[in-house]
């Protein structure tokens, strides 16, 4: 529906809308960087300038976080009253042989704008550790996961190792081996036999609570 926008620009616009509906105010540029997987704030500023030029947003250069979503984007508005909100389960633990969404595993339900959620079988997982910091996924962040049991090379997955520990890593299949690659320059990849790894789902989004 955003025919004049790139994929990144759509992600940025939808993220801004979602933060306004969830928090009541727009995100900082650094938060946008993290949310859409960009490392450079100048790249985000470039996308924001394009969104403003096309009439999707209005910025106030004299104020931080001063981004207003304009009427043009409200064809797909997540801040409007008609926007569908869905509740995704926050899963406290993942255990082999037990359904992920078993009631005893669910800590709470978190509301999300439906337009930001890919797939139809999603859950939220709290990240522990710093193995994915280069991908913008930090300790105590929350990831949105599309429940699947297969993955393509380079996708970020939630995987169960030897039926015991769940981990978030980038997935690569190399012959009969699986490489679970951290996004941290100080950590080594995990190499496992195919039979030792169970794909739980694909990470499709990340968000954090600013304390």
UniProtKB/Swiss-Prot annotation:
GO MF term list: DNA binding; serine-type endopeptidase activity
**Transit peptide in keyword set:** no
In terms of superkingdom, the source organism counts as Bacteria
Question: What residues make up the catalytic site?
Answer: 131, 169
Q: Which residues bind DNA?
A: 29-49
Q: Quote the Pfam families the UniProt record gives.
A: LexA_DNA_bind, Peptidase_S24
Q: Gene3D superfamilies, alphabetically?
A: Umud Fragment, subunit A, Winged helix-like DNA-binding domain superfamily/Winged helix DNA-binding domain
BP-aspect Gene Ontology terms? DNA repair; DNA replication; negative regulation of DNA-templated transcription; proteolysis; SOS response
Q: Which reaction does it catalyse?
A: Hydrolysis of Ala-|-Gly bond in repressor LexA
- What keywords tag this UniProt record? Autocatalytic cleavage, DNA damage, DNA repair, DNA replication, DNA-binding, Hydrolase, Repressor, SOS response, Transcription, Transcription regulation
Provide the E.C. number(s) assigned to this enzyme: 3.4.21.88
Q: Where is this site: Cleavage?
A: 96-97
Q: What does this protein do?
A: Represses a number of genes involved in the response to DNA damage (SOS response), including recA and lexA. In the presence of single-stranded DNA, RecA interacts with LexA causing an autocatalytic cleavage which disrupts the DNA-binding part of LexA, leading to derepression of the SOS regulon and eventually DNA repair.
Q: Which NCBIfam families match?
A: lexA (TIGR00498)
Q: What family does the database annotate?
A: Belongs to the peptidase S24 family.
Q: Share what the entry says about its subunit structure, partners included.
A: Homodimer.
Q: What is this protein called?
A: LexA repressor
Q: What organism is the protein native to?
A: Clostridioides difficile (strain 630) (Peptoclostridium difficile)
């Amino acid at each position: 529906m955003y025919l004049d926008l790139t994929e990144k620009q759509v992600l940025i616009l939808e993220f801004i809308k979602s933060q306004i509906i969830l928090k009541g105010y727009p995100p900082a540029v650094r938060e946008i960087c993290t949310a859409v997987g960009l490392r450079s704030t100048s790249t985000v500023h470039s996308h924001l300038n394009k969104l403003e030029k096309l009439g999707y947003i209005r910025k106030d250069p004299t104020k931080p976080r001063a981004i207003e979503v304009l009427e043009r984007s409200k064809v797909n508005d997540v801040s409007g009253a008609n926007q569908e909100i869905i509740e995704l389960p926050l899963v406290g633990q993942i255990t082999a042989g037990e359904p992920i969404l078993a009631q005893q595993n669910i800590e709470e339900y978190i509301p999300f704008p439906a337009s930001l959620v890919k797939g139809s079988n999603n859950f939220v997982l709290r990240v522990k550790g710093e193995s994915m910091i280069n991908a913008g996924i930090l300790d105590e962040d929350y990831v949105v996961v599309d429940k699947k049991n297969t993955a393509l090379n380079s996708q970020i997955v939630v995987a169960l190792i030897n039926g015991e520990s769940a981990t978030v890593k980038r997935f690569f299949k190399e012959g009969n081996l699986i490489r679970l690659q951290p996004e941290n320059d100080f950590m080594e990849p995990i190499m496992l036999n195919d039979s030792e790894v169970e794909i739980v789902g694909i990470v499709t989004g990340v968000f954090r609570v600013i304390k």
